[in-house]
């Protein structure tokens, strides 16, 4: 039964979510079509209601839901058994895992009726389609070559952006997309696409190995790219079955227990801090001991095999809960909010239109003129909010770039203690023998790059926290401005119709009276257009992190490293040569190396601080500018729509006789149709919630 709960239940629950997604997407599309047809009919009757913004928003949401997938990013160092794990997860020997080859390109695994691989290039070449065998042959390399490339700072396939593998697998068909990233070393980790996926996936599956618990490379990656960034990570400790094999006496139960407990302590000590959600420790729902090879062998013999004892049932149960309950519900809730909003806007517009049908042209003009002061107030609210965004932008850009500047200038102060953990094993004789000098220089350069990368990552985390706080403040302001804005729009309605607007006091935040631009600005709605490998994620709120990411990966750290390393190695070499053969003690040489490195570093820090702090300033500024552009556009759209809704009616009245009865009937049926679509969406959403109990 446990196994049924794992694989089959996961597939069933995914299927259920896919059906609800598809149903809601269809309802949103119908809602959009209904409103659109009514708008077209308005041209020959009392004029359009100007609902363009709602039409655009719900059709984007519908498209996003139609394409909706759960994206899982698989991360892990070389030789952690990632491919074996993935093959076990999907139940087929799909990815190359024999004799340790490494997939050397970022691979996106998604559903396709035909098996095929498409390679996407980054140099303008057209994508290339391959069959499976050719892909395995052409784009995998053995670990020795991978290590060599890493040391030389080279990529195996520098012209390849990513590969898309399409495959007719049930798990993929039900809406799972798997992104397999090549490795954790810095060149790959800093790759914009990999980092982009880290920030744009539903969950990260971080594969480790029981026999190599929490290596320095893994700890550095987690510290630099995962820590404190609000990401959902599942840690999969692979090859747990090998713990037993590594014992002197594999049958000694006590020794096995002691060995496993020691390992668990190491993992717990290193991973617990990544398993807190809203202050709650959920380690047991995030860390799993797996035997992927056992699970794979069983599933290849029988896709329905019992996987008890491999760790897979527990892991899949937890992943299932996370994706089909937490994540799916959040995504569908947004769609429901948009639908409610579109229906409310339609009903409000009808409510304003009906009383005005009875007025003649002069009376209508008089009423339109009477609300001019209110429109001025709306513009004023927009300007106030815009001003606040700009003030926040300037303060943050200045503050964050200053913090970068002083951070860089202060690196020298703690360099000697900080650099210790990175320093290569130092054998001075190696350095003096020409044959090994090259290798020594390479090791030193790598150590220095790691040091800079880690320092930069630590700084970006504090910068992100500051920016996040600033956006939270703006979100609160958006709520306030939104409330004032709604009061004014209510006054407009009252003046136009001569009827009081009733306010429902018992609404939740999602359905409060906030205008839709304010909901967007508060981060309740996210309508991303899709950037990475053509798919957007329905995350919540405005995605400023991707903007920062683009700036920081492009400049960032690569720029700093190049600026400093080249000039850096020469003087260190001279300093070491100057010690002469009399000073062969490693300790003395080590001190000398750090001293010279510091001296050289300090020379270049002011230049780096000066050049790069401008980039940091621009990056932060662009985050707030992008936010302001969208907010202002949405407010302007709303003001324009409110005006044109009135102008449309006036124009129709001036040019034709409006059939009042016909309009009453048309609006009544429009209102019934949109409410019916909304009820379908509400029902689909509630049924899913009820099913999860």
Can you say where each PLM-predicted feature lies in the sequence?
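Core structural elements
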Residues: 50, 284-295, 341-348
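N-terminal low-complexity/disordered regulatory or targeting extensions
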Residues: 1-79, 92-164, 228, 455-497, ...
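Alpha-helical heptad-repeat coiled-coil segments that mediate oligomerization/polymerization in large
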Residues: 350-371, 375-378, 382-385, 389, ...
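C-terminal modules of long, charged coiled-coil scaffolds in eukaryotic assembly complexes
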Residues: 511-539, 543-544, 548-553, 645-693
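A non-catalytic, extended alpha-helical scaffold characteristic of dynamin-superfamily P-loop GTPases
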Residues: 369-624
């Amino acid at each position: 039964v446990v196994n049924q709960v794992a694989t089959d239940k996961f597939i069933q629950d995914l299927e259920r979510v896919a059906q609800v997604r598809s149903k809601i997407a269809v309802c949103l599309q119908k809602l959009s079509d209904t409103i659109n047809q009514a708008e077209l009919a308005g041209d020959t009757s009392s004029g359009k209601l100007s609902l363009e913004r709602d039409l655009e928003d719900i059709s984007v949401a519908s498209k996003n839901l139609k394409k909706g997938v759960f994206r899982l990013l698989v991360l892990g160092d070389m030789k952690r058994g990632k491919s074996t794990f993935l093959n076990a997860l999907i139940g087929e020997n799909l990815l190359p895992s024999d004799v340790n080859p490494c997939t050397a390109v970022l691979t996106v695994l998604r559903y396709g009726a035909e098996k095929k691989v498409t390679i996407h290039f980054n140099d303008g070449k057209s994508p290339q389609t391959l069959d499976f065998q050719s892909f395995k042959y052409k784009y995998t390399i053995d670990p020795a070559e991978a290590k060599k490339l890493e040391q030389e700072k080279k990529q195996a396939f520098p012209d390849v952006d990513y590969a898309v593998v399409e495959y007719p697998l049930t798990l993929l068909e039900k809406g799972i997309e798997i992104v397999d990233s090549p490795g954790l070393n810095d060149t790959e980790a800093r790759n914009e696409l990999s980092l982009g996926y880290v920030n744009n996936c539903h969950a990260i599956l971080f594969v480790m190995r029981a026999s190599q618990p929490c290596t320095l490379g893994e700890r550095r990656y987690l510290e630099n790219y995962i820590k404190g960034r609000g990401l959902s990570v599942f840690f999969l400790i692979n090859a747990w079955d090998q713990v037993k094999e590594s014992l002197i006496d594999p049958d000694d139960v006590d020794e096995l227990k002691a060995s496993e407990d020691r390992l668990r302590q190491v993992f717990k000590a290193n991973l617990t801090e990544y398993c807190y959600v809203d202050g709650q420790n959920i380690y047991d729902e995030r860390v799993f001991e797996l035997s992927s090879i056992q699970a794979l062998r069983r599933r290849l013999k029988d896709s329905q095999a019992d996987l008890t004892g491999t760790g897979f049932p527990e892991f899949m149960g937890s992943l299932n809960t996370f994706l089909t309950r937490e994540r799916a519900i959040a995504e569908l809730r947004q769609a429901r909010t948009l639908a409610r909003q579109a229906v409310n806007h339609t009903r409000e517009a009808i409510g304003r239109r009906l009383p005005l049908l009875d007025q003649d042209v002069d009376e209508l003009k008089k009423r339109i003129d009477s609300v001019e002061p209110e429109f001025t107030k709306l513009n004023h609210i927009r300007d106030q909010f815009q001003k606040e965004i700009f003030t926040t932008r300037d303060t943050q850009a200045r503050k964050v770039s200053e913090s970068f500047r002083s951070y860089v200038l202060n690196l020298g102060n703690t360099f000697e203690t900080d650099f210790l953990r990175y320093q290569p094993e130092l054998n001075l004789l190696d350095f003096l023998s020409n044959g090994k000098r090259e290798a020594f220089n390479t090791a030193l350069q790598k150590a220095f790059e790691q040091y800079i990368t880690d320092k930069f990552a630590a700084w970006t985390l504090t910068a992100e926290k500051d920016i996040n706080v600033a956006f939270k403040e703006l979100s609160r302001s958006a709520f306030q401005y939104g409330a004032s804005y709604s009061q004014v729009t209510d006054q407009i309605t009252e003046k136009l119709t001569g009827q009081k607007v009733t306010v429902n006091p018992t609404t939740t935040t999602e359905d409060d009276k906030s205008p839709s631009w304010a909901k967007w600005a508060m981060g309740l709605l996210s309508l991303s257009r899709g950037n990475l490998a053509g798919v957007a994620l329905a995350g919540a709120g405005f995605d400023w992190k991707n903007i920062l990411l683009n700036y920081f990966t492009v400049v960032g750290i690569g720029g700093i490293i190049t600026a400093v390393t080249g000039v850096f190695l020469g003087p260190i070499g001279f300093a070491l040569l100057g010690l002469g053969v009399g000073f062969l003690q490693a300790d003395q040489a080590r001190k000398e190396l750090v001293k010279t490195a510091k001296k050289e570093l300090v020379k270049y820090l002011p230049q780096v601080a000066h050049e790069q702090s401008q980039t940091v300033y621009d990056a932060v500024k662009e985050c707030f500018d992008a936010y302001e552009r969208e907010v202002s556009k949405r407010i302007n759209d709303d003001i324009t729509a409110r005006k044109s809704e009135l102008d449309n009616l006036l124009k129709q009245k001036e040019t034709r006789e409006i059939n009042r009865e016909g309009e009453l009937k048309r609006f009544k049926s429009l209102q019934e149709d949109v409410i019916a679509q909304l009820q379908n969406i509400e029902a689909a959403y509630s049924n899913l919630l009820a099913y999860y109990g």
